[in-house]
Amino acid sequence: MLQIENLRKIIYKHRKELHSIAEIGLKEFKTSKYIRDYLDKINVNYNTYLDTAIVGKINGKIGTKTIAFRSDMDGLVTDEGVKHLCGHDGHMSILLGLIELINDNKELLNDNIVFIFQPAEEGPGGANELIKLGIMEE
């Protein structure tokens, strides 16, 4: 079972890596690959949308309710290049840690968990595009 101190280290590692590859909205290709590679490593299923968005689900034993967790993915353009200045690197890292914790304890899970890594939170509006694609209906 994943221990809290190990989880903290994993989240910090994710944040450091994701901070170093900040990308603008709808062009989060390195970021998306990093997340997909990690989800593959921990054997969590997902689908991709809009080239960079990632949506996955961990099924609970009962599964009559579904709880969703979302993280933004994009950085901001600055005079020094693209940077994570709004904490999106932290949001993604925390969500990856939560996914791993839930996945490691899924035998205790009654409800379904959906996770959404949403591109273009800062613009041009990745959430609206994902909703139009029907991710909230699945």
Question: Language-model segments: what does each one mean?
Answer:
Residues 1-110, 114:
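Acidic/His- and Gly-rich active-site-bordering loop/insert found
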